[in-house]
Amino acid sequence: MSTDPTSKPAFPITDEVRHALAVTKRGVDELLIEEEFAQKLAKSAATGKPLRIKLGLDPTAPDIHLGHTVVLNKMRQLQDLGHTVIFLIGDFTSLIGDPSGRNATRPPLTREQIESNAKTYFEQAALVLDREKTEIRYNSEWSMPLGADGMIKLASRYTVARMLEREDFTKRFQGGIPISIHEFLYPLMQGYDSVALNADLELGGTDQKFNLLVGRELQKQYGQEQQCILTMPLLEGLDGVEKMSKSKGNYVGISEKPTDMFGKLMSISDVLMWRYFELLSFRSLDEIARFRGEAEGGRNPRDFKVMLAQEIVARFHSQADAERALEDFNHRAKGGVPDDIPAVTLAGAPLAIGQLLKQAGLVPSTSEALRNIEQGGVKIDGATVSDKALKVDAGEFVVQVGKRRFARVTLTA
């Protein structure tokens, strides 16, 4: 036994603790420091005091997509183990703008944008988290009262040299790309959140590792027990290349219609499907490994893609919605028209095909409409449109763009 009076008592690593550690580690990129976290779990089990687990999200956009749920799923697993989950809305840090992974300064949001986005943030996150067991906090609670004096004192706790250890800052500095002083404040303020919340564990994407470590360092300086950090992989988007992002158009929003969600998930590659199983499915790793073995043995990978799509749709909607989405998908695959397509009434016949598609809400612009026509992706009542100069006469007809976009159009003069 250690004679060091500052050493902490060791708590027994029981089977319960080993199970909790295994649940925690599933699908993670990194857990720092694992031995410390095992002791935190052991202490929690021995004392009955739950750990305080923090996830901060800046409301930079109003919608949450499946990429966000990778870390939310992990929060739910930890919540189900009995720990306290803190869903931290970064309404103050959003005013600064997170520079993580950026090669240029990210423009900060306005207060109005932040408040608007934050309204829907937790409602969507609650589709994953247990609402009754989640503590919701806003970091403006402790960041706003700091004032200039407190901000300067906080800034004195970290050096510019340490900030430049961060890869994205280093690249910008070496490349002569400007770095604003306020960007150095972001990791400091995120780290200070951990001090204010006395966090035991903080979660984030792999691009957040530096910021999470700042929190650990600040806790030490403030005399707190240091948080452990857990980073989750960034989910690739539908293209399988870049990370899922609304701005890149390769995302699946968790509030999308069941049919749209199902169709998007069925569009991913067979290779990407296994990545989605690992990061998004709640099935056991043994079951996923068995599925993969069956696919390699000759079973159609589509069977497993359907299972994945149904599981995810059911989670955010219902099992009945998932079944209907499958029926709808199979119907469309056979060339059928879905039952629930929107009805649109337009005027101005004869109307240019590009304008018709745009006004019907099937494309964002006429240039996008013309591109789809060039690719043979536009149909009127099942007939492919090839003439980009087509003028559509008055009447009622079904218009289709791509595989999933339909509208029942009534066009008048």
Curated annotation (Swiss-Prot):
Motif ('KMSKS' region): 243-247
Motif 'HIGH' region: positions: 59-68
Residues that, per the record, bind ATP: K246
Ligase keyword on record: yes
InterPro entries the UniProt entry points to: aa-tRNA-synth_I_CS, aa-tRNA-synth_Ic, Rossmann-like_a/b/a_fold, S4_RNA-bd, S4_RNA-bd_sf, Tyr-tRNA-ligase, Tyr-tRNA-ligase_bac-type, Tyr-tRNA-ligase_bac_2
Keywords in alphabetical order: Aminoacyl-tRNA synthetase, ATP-binding, Cytoplasm, Ligase, Nucleotide-binding, Protein biosynthesis, RNA-binding
Superkingdom classification of source: Bacteria
SUPFAM superfamilies, sorted: Alpha-L RNA-binding motif, Nucleotidylyl transferase
Gene3D superfamilies: HUPs (3.40.50.620), RNA-binding S4 domain (3.10.290.10), Tyrosyl-Transfer RNA Synthetase (1.10.240.10)
GO MF term list: ATP binding; RNA binding; tyrosine-tRNA ligase activity
Listed Pfam families: S4, tRNA-synt_1b
GO biological process, alphabetically ordered: tyrosyl-tRNA aminoacylation
NCBIfam families linked: tyrS
Protein name, per record: Tyrosine--tRNA ligase
Species, as recorded: Burkholderia mallei (strain ATCC 23344)
